Amino acid sequence: IQHQTSELWMKLVIHELAEAMGYIRSDELESSFKILARVKHIQHQLLSQWDVLATLTPSEYVQFRHVLGTGSGFQSAQYRRIEFMMGNKDRNMLRVHAHDPDATAALTKALEAPSVYDEFLRHLARRGFAIPEDLLTRDVSEAHEANAQVVEVFKGIYQNPEKHWDAYEMCEKLVDVEEQFA
């Protein structure tokens, strides 16, 4: 049951992240705030499900452990898709799903699409923030590397939240989601 409910929650996270990215692409940050808050709550629900299993003693757990197999939640195609949508990209992770053509196709599409973070950087560039052009045209299937210019942009947003309220709030929402994901 745990696995099935987790997969349902992850399916909802994927849907919500796609919706949020659409709003960010359309420069409607405010519309994405509630969605990202919902994602944070879904993530919390996913994590809190494990509290029930924590009540089991080792001897109770051993009684049914054999039926769980050797799989890991990290092998879930939906989990990996969420990772890619959030920007944690690694092409090598496709290999885990090579046996499943549908999962591989969905994951490849997510890997090669801009992440939530990519869309936010593009939004900031459209607003005139100094996002380096090479970040906007980079291969989005690769993981991000730290960039001093982007750090300066975020520093400016945080030093003047009243002037850049929606960008500031989006930064906070992304941190909230990332903290729940990590």
What is each of the regions a protein language model found here?
Residues 1-182:
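Surface-exposed peri-terminal alpha-helical interaction modules
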